[in-house]
């Protein structure tokens, strides 16, 4: 743990960064668990992938650690994924995928 002396504006930015890094990530875990309901695959099957992803940002910038179909522009995989999702899930998948694409051009 590290102590930083910051201005109010910096603390506010740190807080919202924490929401993106932690709160929204936890929502993604919840959504992943929901997607695995009614399968014979437990959420724990994702834990090695989650741990590997988290470990990468200790040595790489988050942008450089980005992987997946949006990063690769793999339209076939993305379209198949969309076919497995509800309308609300599709909207979020598309929004996040587009953000990944924009940041990795």
Positions of PLM-derived features:
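NAD(P)-dependent Rossmann-like dehydrogenase/reductase catalytic/cofactor-binding core
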Residues: 44-105
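Internal alpha-helical scaffold of NAD(P)-dependent oxidoreductase catalytic cores
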Residues: 1-58
């Amino acid at each position: 743990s590290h102590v930083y002396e910051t201005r109010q504006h910096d603390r506010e930015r740190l807080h919202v960064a924490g929401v993106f890094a932690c709160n929204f990530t936890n929502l993604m875990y919840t959504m992943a668990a929901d997607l695995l309901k009614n399968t014979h695959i437990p959420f724990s099957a994702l834990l090695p992938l989650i741990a590997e992803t988290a470990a990468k940002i200790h040595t790489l910038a988050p942008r450089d650690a980005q992987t997946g179909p949006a990063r690769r522009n793999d339209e076939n995989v993305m379209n198949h994924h969309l076919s497995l999702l509800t309308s609300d899930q599709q909207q979020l998948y598309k929004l996040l995928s587009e953000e990944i694409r924009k940041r990795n051009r």
